[in-house]
């Protein structure tokens, strides 16, 4: 992969190298314990959490006795970087904040108190991956304290620890690796990636090339799927490039768009100087990796690779301005000796300076690409096992509802949770079906789940009374299980089972197996089950997803009963620059600014046939953005755009489906 060892270690390096190792998230504590046991003088690295604007509002509200619901009313839509002294401007510029009652009582009191504590230290937390290793007792250098799990943690944060010259290692918890392991374990045959090459597998290539990568590590976000389609990624090298150019440093500089155009032959490949062609020809003359800084500094200024790595490190987010000036003079003088014209060498330096601090290490990008290819292979060949693992590990860009719908689009049957069949985790009950795990049921404790799985080994539950007697769940647990359908098929309707559970829980706790009420449970009348729409709503409330149909079915919209005049997501490829009307629930979003500094928004909506991307340019965002405070569903009128074969919708009008299709359209 043409990785530069000097990026890791070189003679001129004054500090320890960067060591980042990813492990499955559910084994990270095990690996930390291993490092503590093996190297002894070890501590986790702390981070110092401060009260941001939203956390200051929450803490102030709680201290003043307000409910979480009241506090969330003003915090949930505020930007994380909101300035509490400038809330009026936020309300005027961000549509979702337009109706927030900043001036009304009691919110004005909460805000006044929050202003006084915003920015103050809140507590010591633990760095997401960092730990420090020493050759002597760490307490000789750093004060320590214990974490709730019993590990020792530094009271200094990352930068002072590095300044002390100690070895820092990042052991990162990665859910994507756990997904891979769980999928392989679930498949009823051995999958050996030392013998299988996902890169050359046709089904895997097609899945990546077409951007059908929801659930796949690192390559599932809307922006990344869009990029995969634009590049028509067909090799490990190109996926490695894509993993880097999606990063903020390359993307925000305009280099990502230049890379796409040059890759597709729509823009000529140019170089600021012929020497750059020697080192940047594979990336169309564009720096996209940290290693590119090393190569350019070496080729243009004659710097050694070790010296060039020192330059790159100095340009990181933790800049040393005095050393930066030294490196700048060294670079420009070296470039001058190599005959580079002044204007050209200054322009090359400007490119390096604006890029180096936010670029991606190629070794990191290549490692990510390898895991991404394996994930794509598993999704292409074992979709049920793969999607069950994604749902179980609760990782990724989307919520469980989006992954359930993706599984449904793959032809996988979604089976609701059931006390006689479900495990704790999601699992593939057969090659084309996923059974929802009891872990997804709200209000259900892990101890109750474990009790259900253990006790039913002695015999399945025959009735609601049998279940209540053997498991003795809390009333809230029994109610949630009934409403989500986990007790369906036990001979009674949901309302009848709920009444029986209610009566059973009103008995004397020490005598629950014997009737102590005048009402005989056996005489409870049978009530009919609720309609399907009510069941669907109950699934949303108890599972935070819909097991039996897409959420828009609540409004009578299904593939078989599609409203006239509406375009499905799967049919967007048939249109180009056409005006259409579409509908969907909100899956995710991204706010950004134009080059003029105006706010705009990208949103991802989903109908039963797929996810589609919608662009709200500043004028439309200001006009309709205020309704984007919930998940929808929404109706969008707009124009379908064709961007290098990828279809998106540019919104011209946005409305809420909650008001009814006919009234919204009119």
Predicted regions and their residues:
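Hydrophobic core residues within well-ordered beta-strands of beta-rich domains
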Residues: 580-582, 601, 627, 634
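OB-fold/S1-family single-stranded nucleic acid-binding modules
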Residues: 641-664
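OB-fold nucleic-acid-binding modules
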Residues: 534-590
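OB-fold (S1/OB) nucleic-acid-binding surfaces
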Residues: 594-619
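Hydrophobic beta-strand positions in extracellular immunoglobulin-like domains
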Residues: 586, 638-640
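Alpha-helical scaffold/interaction cores of sigma-54-like transcription cofactors
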Residues: 1-496, 501-509, 513, 590-593
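Short nucleic-acid-contacting surface segments enriched for D/E, G, S/T with interspersed K/R
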Residues: 620-637
């Amino acid at each position: 992969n043409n990785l530069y060892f000097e990026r890791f270690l070189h003679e001129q390096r004054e500090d320890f190298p960067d060591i980042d190792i990813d492990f499955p998230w559910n084994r990270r504590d095990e690996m930390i314990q291993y490092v503590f046991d093996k190297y002894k003088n070890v501590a986790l690295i702390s981070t110092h959490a401060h009260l941001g604007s939203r956390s200051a509002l929450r803490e102030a509200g709680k201290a003043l006795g307000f409910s979480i619901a009241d506090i969330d009313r003003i915090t949930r839509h505020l930007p994380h970087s909101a300035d509490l002294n400038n809330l009026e401007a936020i309300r005027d510029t961000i549509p979702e904040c337009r109706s927030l009652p900043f001036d009304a009582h009691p919110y004005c009191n909460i805000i006044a108190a929050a202003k006084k504590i915003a920015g103050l230290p809140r507590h010591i937390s633990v760095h997401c991956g960092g730990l420090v290793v020493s050759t002597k007792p760490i307490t000789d250098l750093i004060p320590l304290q214990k974490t709730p799990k019993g590990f020792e943690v530094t009271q200094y944060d990352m930068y002072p620890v590095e300044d002390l010259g100690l070895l820092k290692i990042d052991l990162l918890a990665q859910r994507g690796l756990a997904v891979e392991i769980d999928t392989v374990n679930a498949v009823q045959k051995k999958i050996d990636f030392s013998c299988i090459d996902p890169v050359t597998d046709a089904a895997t290539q097609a899945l990546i090339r077409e951007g059908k990568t929801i659930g796949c590590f690192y390559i599932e976000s809307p922006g990344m799927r869009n990029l995969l389609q634009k590049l028509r990624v067909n090799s490990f090298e190109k996926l490695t490039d894509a993993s880097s150019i999606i990063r903020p440093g390359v993307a925000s500089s305009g280099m990502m768009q230049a890379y796409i155009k040059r890759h597709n032959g729509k823009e000529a490949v140019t170089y600021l100087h012929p020497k750059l062609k020697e080192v940047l020809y594979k990336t169309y003359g564009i720096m996209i990796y940290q290693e590119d800084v090393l190569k350019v500094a070496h080729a243009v200024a004659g710097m050694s690779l070790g010296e060039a790595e020192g330059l790159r490190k100095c340009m990181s987010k933790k800049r040393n301005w005095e050393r930066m000036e030294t490196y700048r003079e060294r670079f420009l003088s070296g470039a001058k000796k190599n005959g580079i014209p002044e204007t050209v060498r200054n322009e090359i330096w400007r490119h390096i300076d604006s890029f180096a601090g936010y670029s991606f290490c190629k070794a990191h990008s290549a490692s990510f690409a390898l895991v991404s290819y394996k994930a794509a292979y598993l999704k292409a060949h074992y979709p049920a096992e793969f999607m069950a693992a994604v749902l179980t590990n609760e990782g990724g860009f989307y919520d469980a509802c989006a992954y359930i719908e993706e599984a449904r689009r793959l032809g996988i049957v979604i089976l609701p949770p059931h006390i006689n069949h479900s495990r704790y985790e999601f699992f593939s009950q057969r090659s084309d079906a996923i059974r929802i795990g009891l872990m997804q049921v709200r209000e259900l404790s892990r101890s109750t789940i474990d009790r259900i799985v253990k006790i039913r080994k002695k015999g399945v539950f025959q009735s609601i009374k049998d279940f209540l007697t053997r498991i003795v769940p809390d009333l809230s647990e029994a109610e949630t299980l009934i409403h989500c359908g986990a007790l369906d098929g036990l001979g009674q309707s949901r309302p009848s089972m709920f009444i029986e559970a209610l009566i059973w829980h009103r008995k004397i706790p020490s005598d629950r197996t014997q009737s102590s009420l005048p009402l005989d449970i056996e005489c409870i009348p049978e009530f009919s089950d609720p309609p399907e729409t009510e069941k669907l709503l109950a699934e949303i409330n108890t599972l935070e997803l819909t097991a039996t149909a897409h959420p828009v079915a609540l409004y009578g919209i299904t593939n078989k009963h599609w409203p006239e005049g509406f375009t499905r997501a799967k049919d967007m490829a048939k249109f180009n620059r056409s005006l259409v009307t579409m509908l969907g629930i909100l899956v995710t979003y991204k706010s950004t600014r134009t080059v003029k500094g105006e706010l705009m928004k990208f949103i991802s909506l989903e109908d039963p046939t797929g996810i589609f991307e919608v662009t709200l340019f500043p004028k439309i965002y200001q006009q309709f953005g205020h309704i984007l405070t919930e998940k929808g569903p929404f109706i969008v009128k707009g124009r379908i755009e064709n961007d290098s074969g990828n279809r998106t919708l540019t919104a011209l009008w946005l409305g809420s489906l909650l008001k009814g299709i006919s009234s919204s359209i009119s």
